[in-house]
């Protein structure tokens, strides 16, 4: 069984992330969306909330699971008995960073491959950071995030502004 792990912070999950998950689900027997717990970074959503939001978006896929992890990605990959780390690439800048990480992961566990998937052109400009910035200035975000979580994101932005 081919198991791929797609790691990230997903704060929030974007249409670009979801597109990659959908494409990976068609290539692997099982895809684990691995939500990174970064204690040094205050997210818009808690880890539990992010896991729940992603689960709402991927509910229709029988071969996609969502889990959180902390520590080394490679340790999580081994624990889940996965073969592959799945990484999305939007730009050359993404590639430079992800290439270095792939080499480091190969050094730590040469049995695990990293597969790079190029982001669909219509999502290549979308990032969680950009979405948060647009939302913080009352901009329209529904074109950037999966429809399943638009309301959740709008409610969170309102509460952060003190409107809710």
Curated annotation (Swiss-Prot):
Q: Which InterPro entries match?
A: Cyt_trans-like (IPR004821), PPAT (IPR001980), Rossmann-like_a/b/a_fold (IPR014729)
What is the protein's major site of localization? Answer: cytoplasm
| GO term, biological process aspect, one | coenzyme A biosynthetic process
**One Pfam match:** CTP_transf_like
Q: Which reaction does it catalyse?
A: (R)-4'-phosphopantetheine + ATP + H(+) = 3'-dephospho-CoA + diphosphate
Cofactor(s) annotated in UniProt = Mg(2+)
Its pathway, per UniProt, is: Cofactor biosynthesis; coenzyme A biosynthesis; CoA from (R)-pantothenate: step 4/5
Annotated site, Transition state stabilizer, chain positions = 17
Query: Which superkingdom?
Result: Bacteria
| GO MF annotation terms | ATP binding; pantetheine-phosphate adenylyltransferase activity
Q: Cellular component GO terms, alphabetically?
A: cytoplasm
Q: Which terms are listed as keywords in the entry?
A: ATP-binding, Coenzyme A biosynthesis, Cytoplasm, Magnesium, Nucleotide-binding, Nucleotidyltransferase, Transferase
Q: Where found? A: Cytoplasm
Its biological purpose: Reversibly transfers an adenylyl group from ATP to 4'-phosphopantetheine, yielding dephospho-CoA (dPCoA) and pyrophosphate.
Family membership, please give it.
Belongs to the bacterial CoaD family.
> Protein name, please?
Phosphopantetheine adenylyltransferase
Q: Which source organism? A: Clostridium perfringens (strain ATCC 13124 / DSM 756 / JCM 1290 / NCIMB 6125 / NCTC 8237 / Type A)
